[in-house]
Amino acid sequence: EACYNAGTFCGIKPGLCCSAICLSFVCISFDF
C-alpha cells in the first residue's frame, strides 16, 4: 500500500506518511 505525501489526510490510517509524521490528522514532513 502506498504511503501518504506531506499534506495528505492521515486521520484514518496514521503511520503511512512518506518520511513524514501524522500531526493534527495531516502528514507533516520533517525533512527540512
Swiss-Prot record:
A GO-annotated cellular component: extracellular region
Superkingdom field: Eukaryota
Keyword Secreted: yes
Compartment(s) of residence: Secreted
Disulfide bonds: C3-C18, C10-C22, C17-C27
Keywords: Disulfide bond, Hydroxylation, Ion channel impairing toxin, Knottin, Neurotoxin, Presynaptic neurotoxin, Secreted, Toxin, Voltage-gated sodium channel impairing toxin
Expressed in which tissues: Expressed by the venom duct.
Residues found modified as 4-hydroxyproline: P14
Main location as per UniProt: secreted
Free-text function comment from the UniProt entry: Delta-conotoxins bind to site 6 of voltage-gated sodium channels (Nav) and inhibit the inactivation process.
Family membership noted in the UniProt record: Belongs to the conotoxin O1 superfamily.
Protein's UniProt name: Delta-conotoxin-like MVID
